[in-house]
C-alpha cells in the first residue's frame, strides 16, 4: 500500500510498477484528493512526454451496417440509431478528408472502417489509400482500424506504409461476454498480436462506463499493459438511443479524471489518448486532463460530432502545451480569442456538441461480414448517404450539419426507458441490464448528473459538408 499518490509516483519513476491493488486504491481516491492524484500522474506524463500533445485525426472510410452485436455501438446493423451509413470511400475521397486534419496539426491519421474484419480486396483498397496519402504527406503517421485481421493482412498494410493498427480490448475479459457475443475477447487479443508480428505499432484501449466494476476496469488496464500497447485510447461510453447500453450513465468528470490517472500510473511511458466521449463526460475538466494524457482526436468522430478543432487547439495552447511537431502555439494563426472560438466555453460544457465511441473508432471488431454494405465496385462511396429515419437532405448547410441532429437533453429516467429490452442483445448483456449487478453508486454522491443525447455527425466523410477540423 502507499501513503499518497506522490510517493507512488516516486516509486514508479524509480522503476517499480504499481500493483492492481494500488491501482484500485488510486481509482477510489475521494474527490478532495483528486488534484493530488492528477498532480502525481502529471509528473509521469511530463517525464516521458514533456509538454507536448499528439493530435490524431479520424477518417471514417465505411460507416454503419455492422452485423456484430457490440452493446455500445451505434453502427450495429439492428441499432435504432440515426447515423450516416455509406460504403467505402475512394482513396481520393479519403485523402481529401485526411487533408483537413493534417492542416489542423494532426501528425497521425486514423483510417477506420466498420465491419467484423476486411476482405483481402478491402485491404487492397486501404493500401491504395495509404499509398496516395503517403505520397503527399510522407511524414504523417497512418493508423488503420479495420476490425479482426486474417493471416497476411497486417503484413500487406505494413508494406503499404501503415505505421500502427488499432484494435481495442474495450473492457475486461471477465466482462466481455456481457458486451458482445458475436466475437470473443481472445479474438481481439489475437488481432493485436497479428499486428505486432507484422511490425505495426499496437494501439489498443478501453471504453469505460459500460457497467464494469472498478475491479474490472483495473483488470482491463493491466491487460493492456501486458499486451504491450504503445498507444492507449480511453473512450467514455456515449449511450446512443437504439443501442442496448442506452440510458447507462455511471461517469462523472471526476471519475473520468481518476480513470485517466490510473491508466497513466499503470502505463507511465505510453501514449494515452482521451478519445470519444471526452466532451460529454470530462466537460470543463478537459484542460486538466491534458496534464495526464498526451494525445487526443481533433474534431469529429466516426458517427458523432466532437468539439470544434479551433476549440481543441485553443484548449491545448491555453493549458500551456504544444502540438507535437508544431511551433510553440499549436493553434497558430487559427487561435482566435474566446469570443471567436466556435463550440467552446459554456456551449461545450453544456454538452451540446457531444461524441460517442462507436464502431471501429474504439478499435472495434464490431461490424458486418466482409463486403456488407460495400459498393458494387468495391471502392466508391455513394453520392447520397443513407440514414435511418425519414429522408432528409444531408449537408444542405453547415448549420444543418452541426445543430439539428442531436436533440434535447434527456433525463436519466427517459434515457433508461428508451433502451432496448432484448432484441439484438446478447443474453449476458440482457441479464446485466436487467439486474442490480452494475457498479455501486456512492450513497452520498449528490452531484448533478448531466445526461445529454449525442449529436450525430452530418459533415465530413460521406457528406458534401466540410468537417470541423
Swiss-Prot record:
Which stretches does UniProt call biased (Low complexity)? 363-384, 405-428
Q: Which pathway does UniProt place it in?
A: Cofactor biosynthesis; biotin biosynthesis; biotin from 7,8-diaminononanoate: step 2/2
Renumbered residue ranges of the record's region Disordered? 326-469
Q: Relay the cofactor remark from the entry.
A: Binds 1 [4Fe-4S] cluster. The cluster is coordinated with 3 cysteines and an exchangeable S-adenosyl-L-methionine. Binds 1 [2Fe-2S] cluster. The cluster is coordinated with 3 cysteines and 1 arginine.
Which CDD domains would you find in this protein's record? Radical_SAM
Binding of [4Fe-4S] cluster: at which residues?
A: 66, 70, 73
Domain (Radical SAM core) ranges: 51-278
Record GO biological process: biotin biosynthetic process
Q: Which InterPro entries match?
A: Aldolase_TIM, BATS_dom, Biotin_synth/BioAB, Elp3/MiaA/NifB-like_rSAM, rSAM
Q: Which keywords fit this entry according to its UniProt record?
A: 2Fe-2S, 4Fe-4S, Biotin biosynthesis, Iron, Iron-sulfur, Metal-binding, S-adenosyl-L-methionine, Transferase
Q: Which GO terms describe its molecular function?
A: 2 iron, 2 sulfur cluster binding; 4 iron, 4 sulfur cluster binding; biotin synthase activity; iron ion binding
Name the coenzymes or cofactors required.
Answer: [4Fe-4S] cluster; [2Fe-2S] cluster
EC number per UniProt: 2.8.1.6
Provide the residue positions that the database annotates as binding [2Fe-2S] cluster.
110, 143, 203, 273
Q: What catalytic activity does the UniProt entry give for this protein? A: (4R,5S)-dethiobiotin + (sulfur carrier)-SH + 2 reduced [2Fe-2S]-[ferredoxin] + 2 S-adenosyl-L-methionine = (sulfur carrier)-H + biotin + 2 5'-deoxyadenosine + 2 L-methionine + 2 oxidized [2Fe-2S]-[ferredoxin]
What is known about its subunit structure? Homodimer.
Q: Function of this protein?
A: Catalyzes the conversion of dethiobiotin (DTB) to biotin by the insertion of a sulfur atom into dethiobiotin via a radical-based mechanism.
Q: Which HAMAP family match?
A: BioB
What family, per the record? Belongs to the radical SAM superfamily. Biotin synthase family.
Q: What is this protein called?
A: Biotin synthase
Which organism was this protein described from? Kocuria rhizophila (strain ATCC 9341 / DSM 348 / NBRC 103217 / DC2201)
Q: What is the lineage of its organism?
A: Bacteria, Bacillati, Actinomycetota, Actinomycetes, Micrococcales
The gene behind this protein is: bioB
Amino acid at each position: 500500500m502507499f501513503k499518497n499518490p506522490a510517493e507512488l509516483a516516486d516509486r514508479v519513476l524509480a522503476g517499480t510498477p504499481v500493483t492492481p491493488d494500488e491501482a484500485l486504491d488510486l481509482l477510489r481516491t475521494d474527490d478532495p484528493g483528486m488534484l493530488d492524484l492528477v498532480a502525481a500522474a502529471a509528473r509521469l506524463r511530463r517525464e516521458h512526454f514533456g509538454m507536448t500533445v499528439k493530435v490524431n485525426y479520424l477518417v471514417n472510410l465505411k460507416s454503419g451496417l455492422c452485423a456484430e452485436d457490440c452493446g455500445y455501438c451505434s453502427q450495429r446493423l439492428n441499432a435504432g440509431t440515426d447515423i450516416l451509413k455509406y460504403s467505402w470511400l475512394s482513396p481520393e475521397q479519403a485523402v481529401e478528408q485526411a487533408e483537413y486534419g493534417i492542416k489542423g496539426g494532426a501528425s497521425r491519421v486514423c483510417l477506420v472502417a466498420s465491419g467484423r474484419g476486411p476482405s483481402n480486396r478491402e485491404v487492397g483498397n486501404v493500401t491504395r489509400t495509404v499509398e496516395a496519402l503517403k505520397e503527399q504527406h510522407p511524414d504523417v503517421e497512418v493508423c488503420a482500424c479495420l476490425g479482426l485481421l486474417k493471416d497476411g493482412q497486417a503484413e500487406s498494410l505494413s508494406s503499404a506504409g501503415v505505421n500502427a493498427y488499432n484494435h481495442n480490448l474495450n473492457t475486461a475479459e471477465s466482462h466481455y461476454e456481457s458486451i458482445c457475443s458475436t466475437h470473443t475477447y481472445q479474438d481481439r487479443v489475437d488481432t493485436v498480436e497479428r499486428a505486432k508480428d507484422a511490425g505495426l505499432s499496437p494501439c489498443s484501449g478501453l471504453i469505460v462506463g459500460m457497467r464494469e466494476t472498478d475491479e474490472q476496469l483495473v483488470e482491463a488496464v493491466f491487460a493492456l499493459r501486458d499486451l504491450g500497447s504503445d498507444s492507449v485510447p480511453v473512450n467514455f461510453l456515449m449511450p446512443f438511443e437504439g443501442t442496448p447500453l442506452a440510458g447507462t450513465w455511471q461517469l462523472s468528470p471526476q471519475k473520468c479524471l481518476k480513470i485517466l490517472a490510473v491508466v497513466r500510473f499503470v502505463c507511465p511511458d505510453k501514449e494515452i489518448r482521451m478519445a470519444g466521449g471526452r466532451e460529454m463526460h470530462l466537460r470543463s475538466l478537459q484542460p486538466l486532463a491534458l496534464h495526464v494524457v498526451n494525445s487526443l482526436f481533433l474534431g469529429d468522430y466516426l458517427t458523432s460530432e466532437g468539439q470544434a478543432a479551433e476549440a481543441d487547439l485553443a484548449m491545448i495552447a491555453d493549458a500551456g502545451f504544444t502540438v507535437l511537431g508544431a511551433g510553440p502555439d499549436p493553434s497558430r494563426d487559427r487561435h482566435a480569442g474566446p469570443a471567436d472560438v466556435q463550440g467552446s466555453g459554456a456551449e461545450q460544457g453544456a454538452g451540446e456538441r457531444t461524441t460517442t465511441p462507436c464502431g471501429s473508432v474504439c478499435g472495434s471488431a464490431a461490424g458486418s461480414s466482409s463486403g456488407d454494405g460495400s459498393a458494387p465496385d468495391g471502392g466508391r462511396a455513394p453520392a447520397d448517404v443513407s440514414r435511418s429515419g425519414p429522408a432528409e437532405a444531408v449537408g444542405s448547410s453547415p448549420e444543418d450539419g452541426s445543430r439539428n441532429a442531436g436533440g434535447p437533453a434527456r433525463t436519466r429516467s427517459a434515457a433508461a426507458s428508451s433502451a432496448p429490452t432484448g432484441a439484438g442483445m446478447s443474453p449476458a448483456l440482457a441479464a446485466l441490464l436487467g439486474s442490480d449487478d452494475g457498479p455501486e453508486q456512492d450513497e452520498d454522491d449528490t452531484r448533478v448528473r448531466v445526461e445529454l443525447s449525442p449529436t450525430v455527425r452530418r459533415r465530413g466523410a460521406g457528406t458534401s459538408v466540410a468537417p470541423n477540423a
